[in-house]
Amino acid sequence: MAKKSNKSNKLSTLQKPSQKDFILTIDSDSEGENEIPDLEEESEVDQELKEEEKPKPKPKPKSKKNKKNKDINNDQEKTEEQEEINPNFTFSLDGFETSTAFDGWDFKVESNGDVTKKPISKDVDLDGILRRKGGLANLAGSDVKVDEKNDEVESEEVEEVEEDDEDEENEQEGDDDDDELALDGFGMSATEASANADDDQDEQEPEDDDEGVEADMDEEYPGSDQEDEKPVEDTAEDMAEFYADEEEATTAKKQLHTTFQSLQLSRPVLKGLSQLGYTKPSPIQSACIPIALLGKDIVAGAVTGSGKTAAYMIPIIERLLYKPAKISSTRVIVLAPTRELAIQVCDVGKKIGQFVNNLNFGLAVGGLNLRQQEQQLKTRPDIVIATPGRLIDHIRNSPSFSIDSLEVLVIDEADRMLDEGFQAELTEILSLIPRHKRQTLLYSATMNTKIQDLIQLSLQKPVRVMIDPPKSAAIKLVQEFVRIRKRDHLKPALLFQLIKSVDPSQQNRIVVFVARKESAHKLRIILGLLGMRVSELHGSLTQEQRLASVNDFKNLTVPVLICTDLAARGLDIPKIEIVINYDMPKTHEIYLHRVGRTARAGREGKSITFVGESTQDRAIVKDAIKSISEEQARNSKQGKAVSRNVDWKEVEELNKIVESKATVIEEVLDEEKQAKEMLHAEMELSKATNMIKHEKEIQSRPRRTWFESEKDKKHQTEVMQQLTKHGKKVNSHKRKAIEVKKENSSRSYKKTKQDRMSVQKKPKSNGKNKK
């Protein structure tokens, strides 16, 4: 019996694997899956996964009901797929404007380089000095009954400033949501109110048309038409030889893409654009993106605020989707003239490519921590946004940073980068960058650069895409001009009167451009003593102060920003309503970049310019009116130029208040100077202690090299080049002699020191030989 039981067990064991090894065929699958027993125990997770993976049973008889059920299931699957493909797309009819959820680009440095959280150096508390002197409290020249609300707003702002001085870090981290709500409210509901306010101002202030402004300027500055000089333009033959065929550019302009999907971009890029609220490409974007994706060189120009940064950043990110995954190298370099513009471009790229895997950005700008940038560049990021000087420094002195595998070079604000100020640095960068198989993209709002300047870039038949004329302002910009005549001393009071007339409940951002850094600082002190919160932005500030000023202005903690031409190019701070030219710029191109800070991306804006008596000021006004009249002939929606009338009696009364505070202004400047000297002494003391403690480590570091010596730096400017010969300084006498030799004219002989000495050494006669 035992033997029989063993045999039966063996048979059962032989039968079990035969059932396990049973393989399903297509026919058996259709017969039914439930007939096959599951002999192994499964976990709940495996059962759920298998239930999801199980195909639905297909019955043999085909009926109409089953067909209907299949159609319903297919429709459900299609809707699910569409939801998965486009989860965050929002369609609007506002062109290429950003949605209300997007509040502009960030001007902060990430991770270890976050200078907003850990300031490297201490700064002088100028607002504290102004409060001790009686400023930043009550707005000068305002009635208490009328402006009770304004005084309440100002008192709240003063309390916020005191809290900011106690804890800057908590303010920057905790108030972001409140600022977003304020900006969203302004963007959604305040447009009609601001338009009505503008209409009320227009009714109160009589304005002249373009012809009236031009006639007034002609009366004030007669005979200046003869001084206008026409610039030398490139011939048609030279342009045909240098640029690609014009048909390619014209066809690109005609192809107006209504959506970004028609540009055949990848899904991660489209998702990033939808996250920013971009639905319709701008004309410069629809024209340049297809050409850039083909790998061709581009020389492009469009008005300010037309989306030029995204026009070159979108095809770059699309191209980097197909890079080798295992090889990390820097493939793209973007050059920008200012640090703030480079930080903004870096944020634009990060937000467009936020859904792209393995896409890294690097930032190399001056004023920030050099060692942290070296550590970031060691990882060899795909895209490096840099200013020219710091890029050369890293190429020469950072050991693990190389640009041998560079594929794309972008020069933003190309006309400024090709000027003589960046000439030496740009030629050095071009000598270090490989020329073979390099794509070069040039973008600017005033791209009127000559071919002679572009030859050094070694472009390969670039496509010239000019969406707008090189000297044209935005369509919805209203340009106002105030004739100062002989009232230059009233300009600070006039500026205060204009800013005070703006309704504070509208949360307007106002940018004031000045010519000199000293005047920007002094205006901040004057307006602060008059009770107005103002920030400044210029080259004398540290990089931490510059970024803090931009962030405070962006977050509306400070509504007025006084700056030099440092902020005239590229900065895209949303909802800047008014630009005031306190000092006239040197050229019409700089004027266009200044007024281009407002009326961006199809919005409305206003510029107010103080016009002096010089012929240069009059020429800029004439060019502005001329460009408007030319555009009005082409496009009826073009902006207008008007002459603004001012109540000079009120300005003179305000000027008396300003003059009464002259001694206080000097006291503030002296106190600030003493505080700066104390901080400088503390810095020198800490520097000396570090030199004593870490002497060996500091001396062991290799010296950083530069492509120019100190003497070469001094002889860079035009004036020094004219006054020098072969690197040596030439005095006035030698320079005059050289000029005379060039003119081939005779010059009267002048006794030298040797001649005078030889006359003195001659012996005097004793008179013996006299008869």
Curated annotation (Swiss-Prot):
Residues 47-56, 69-79, 695-717 have a biased composition (Basic and acidic residues). It comes from the Eukaryota. It catalyses: ATP + H2O = ADP + phosphate + H(+). GO terms for molecular function: ATP binding; ATP hydrolysis activity; RNA binding; RNA helicase activity. Gene3D superfamilies: P-loop containing nucleotide triphosphate hydrolases. CDD domains: DEADc_DDX27, SF2_C_DEAD. The keyword Nucleotide-binding applies. It is found in: Nucleus, Nucleolus. A motif (Q motif) lies at residues 258-286. Residues 57-68, 725-736, 759-771 have a biased composition (Basic residues). ATP binds at residues 302-309. Residues 289-465 form the Helicase ATP-binding domain. The keyword Nucleotide-binding applies. One of its GO terms (biological process) is rRNA processing. A motif (DEAD box) lies at residues 412-415. Residues 33-84 form a coiled coil. The Q motif is unique to and characteristic of the DEAD box family of RNA helicases and controls ATP binding and hydrolysis. Associates with pre-ribosomal particles. Belongs to the DEAD box helicase family. DDX27/DRS1 subfamily. ATP-binding RNA helicase involved in ribosome assembly. This is ATP-dependent RNA helicase DRS1. It comes from Debaryomyces hansenii (strain ATCC 36239 / CBS 767 / BCRC 21394 / JCM 1990 / NBRC 0083 / IGC 2968). The lineage of its organism: Eukaryota, Fungi, Dikarya, Ascomycota, Saccharomycotina. The gene is DRS1.
